[in-house]
């Protein structure tokens, strides 16, 4: 099975390649960064490069598109680059995949495409998204690319799987989510300040995300699927578990206890369609961070 991965040097990309190697897939990686692992076919190239199609073999089974300008702060500072990379780069890959008859296009989207969550409501893939409630250039760029993929699928493009990733955490040294950041502060400081301890997300470990990508291989038609954690974990949950794991007690302060922010995207469809659900609970996930914080 021939698998192409854009953003192969990213946090998710490296974890995905590690999993794929155990499954004996034929891997081709694209990234603008220099390679850290020479043990697979790699091309240092920008996804906007019109010549990228030359490195895609004919009739590849899956193209997994992870590459993006993904930090929201970067997207706000550089909105033109954000849409150039995330939208035009994706269109260039769609064209390239079409020319080379790729069988399935898997697109890494995000739970941030969902607008406001009111009173911890659960949203699913059929929920109406009001772009007037969006203040994230990153989320808008992902929504535009999702729409472009739907349009191209309707025009005869290959099978399309859009995976809306939840808030991902895992063993890494930078670009932390709230999970890694809090765990590091509990480990290295005696005091931590958060907005509201009741703020919560359905955090999901990177290894569960990559397993979800693999589980979606071969999915027919056009599909949008959330890959999120099984339950909402609050900042208090993370702090309490971190203290338990590290056998340490710290002072916890709230700067805005009444400003509770909860995002609750369902993962029920993933269980139904691809038989996926997270396996890494928060305690095990936090323990995996110890060497990195």
Regions found by a protein language model. Give the residues of each.
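Rossmann-fold cofactor-recognition segment
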Residues: 36-50
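Short-chain dehydrogenase/reductase
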Residues: 81-83, 134-143, 176-180, 202-203, ...
């Amino acid at each position: 099975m021939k698998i192409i991965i854009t953003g192969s040097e990213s946090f998710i990309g490296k974890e995905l390649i590690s999993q794929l190697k155990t499954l004996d897939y034929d891997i081709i990686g694209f990234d603008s960064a220099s390679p850290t692992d020479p043990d697979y076919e790699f091309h240092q190239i920008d996804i906007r490069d019109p010549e990228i199609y030359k490195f895609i073999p004919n009739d590849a089974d899956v193209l997994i598109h992870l590459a993006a300008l993904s930090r929201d702060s970067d997207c706000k500072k550089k909105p033109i680059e954000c849409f150039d990379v995330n939208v035009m780069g994706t269109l260039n890959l769609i064209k390239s995949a079409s020319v080379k008859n790729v069988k399935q296009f898997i697109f890494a989207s995000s739970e941030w495409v969902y607008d406001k969550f009111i009173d911890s409501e659960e949203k699913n893939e059929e929920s109406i998204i009001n772009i007037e409630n969006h203040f994230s250039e990153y989320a808008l760029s992902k929504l535009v690319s999702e729409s472009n993929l739907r349009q191209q699928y309707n025009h005869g493009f290959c099978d399309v799987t859009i995976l809306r990733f939840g808030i991902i955490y895992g063993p890494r040294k930078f670009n932390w989510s709230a999970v890694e950041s809090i765990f590091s502060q509990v480990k290295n400081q005696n005091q931590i300040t958060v907005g509201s301890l009741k703020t919560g997300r359905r955090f999901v470990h990177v290894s569960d995300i990559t397993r979800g990508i693999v589980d979606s291989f071969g999915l027919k038609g056009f599909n949008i699927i959330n890959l999120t954690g099984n339950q909402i974990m609050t900042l208090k949950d993370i702090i309490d578990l971190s203290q338990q794991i590290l056998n340490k007690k710290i002072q916890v302060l709230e700067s805005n206890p009444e400003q509770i922010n909860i995002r609750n995207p369902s993962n029920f469809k993933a269980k139904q369609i691809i038989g996926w659900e997270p396996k890494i609970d928060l305690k095990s996930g936090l323990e995996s961070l110890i060497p990195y914080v």
